[in-house]
Amino acid sequence: LMADRAAVESALDQVETVLQTWSDEAEAAGKAEAIAEPLSRFQSQKQTLQASLERRQLAVAVVGESRTGKSTLMELLQSQAMADAPLAQLALREVTLASETGLAEDEFAADDAVLLVTEGDMTQSALNLIQARVMDGQGVVLAFNKTDYYDPADREAVLHQLEQHTATLPTPVEVVSIAAAPRAIKVRRYDENGTTSETLEAAPVEMDSLYTCLKRTFLADTPALVAATTLRQVRGLRREVQTELNTLRRDRARAQVDQLQWVAAAAAFANPVPTIDLLATVAINGQLIMDLGKVYGFNLSLEEAKTAASTLARLTVKLGLVELSTQVLTAVLKSHFATYLAGGIVQGLSAAYLTRMAGLSLMEYFEEAALAGTPTQDVSWEAIAARLRSAIQRNGQTRFLQSLAQQGIERLKPGAKVALSVAE
């Protein structure tokens, strides 16, 4: 789960590619000036991340619930670092963990490692936290503090429980027992005259095992931990830039969907199909998929797009979406446009509706796939079909359908000059 320098440099190259694509497409769209400031900011962030690969100091979050001894532990670590130079490479910050709510997902985005402090068995939120940190390539050490509050048998039992928890993690996490602020020890003294006296004396701090552990884990793995943090940040930057690029592309994609929905409507109106299921092949065609894929950087050949369209149309029929779309549009026509209930009009509007819903679903999927860096060959048409079903359910409001029907009737009714010319 650790990263290396090569992985970071590859990710930085991907950021540069997306930045250049965004710049080129913005210029082509006449929006170069509008993106100049954010483009410059993103380029500066990229350079900063490139340079951060060279840092030697580790950012360590000291995490634990209230009153687990985090502050005292940090003071001891900072004091020890004055005499133990390697520990001075640890830049510590304190984070309080609420057992009920946990912490925000990005709370530890800039941390190279996490030192989790507990005074007993772990809560589920603490276990979830270290599991997520391990999965993100961050270093993790678990410090069992206040061990002086336990008798030897109970101390061993808690330690065993903690080790069992960490054994379930993808990579090993060390557990160390410490006493950062041990309770005073009661000492009884017997005087020569036979009298006794009792005093409380400070017990020795038990932190050496933690100092050794931190040097053996965090500090020994500094290059890999720095690379892992930088890689997370570079990937986050790529998603930010890709989000901006998606926004730029969305206007182009919507314009294409607007055009293709009326092309499909005109085709279905002019040549009604014998069964409504065949509307899927009219509405969801290779041109729609190829054009939208190209907008978002998923370059499919026409043959690949036709095969994909056939798959998506078949899934659409299987899910009953053609029948559903026809039913909702027929209901709207009966209520508001009864004069235009002819079969050709219904099929034309149904084709337009399906094309629009398929187009919006493809746009949504392609945007998320671009954010995730999904290659073209891994595009899931089943996932797109599921999104299409969700889109139809979300966009079944009467007002939206009335607007679509009104536009469609104006285009398809007898005498409308644009009825068939939209396919030009």
Predicted segments with their positions:
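Conserved G1/Walker A P-loop phosphate-binding module
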Residues: 1-102, 360
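Transmembrane alpha-helical segments and their cytosolic interface motifs
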Residues: 51-66, 245-284, 310-320
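Conserved Switch II/interswitch segment of TRAFAC-class P-loop GTPases
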Residues: 108-127, 140-155
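Canonical P-loop GTPase G-domain recognition
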Residues: 150-226
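Active-site helix-to-loop segments that bind/position phosphate- or nucleotide-bearing substrates
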Residues: 224-251
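Short hydrophobic membrane-inserting alpha-helices and related fusion/pore-forming segments
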Residues: 266-279, 326-351
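Hydrophobic alpha-helical transmembrane segments and adjacent short intramembrane/lumenal linkers
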Residues: 294, 298-336, 340-344
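Acidic, carboxylate-rich catalytic segments that either coordinate divalent cations
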Residues: 347, 359-363, 367-424
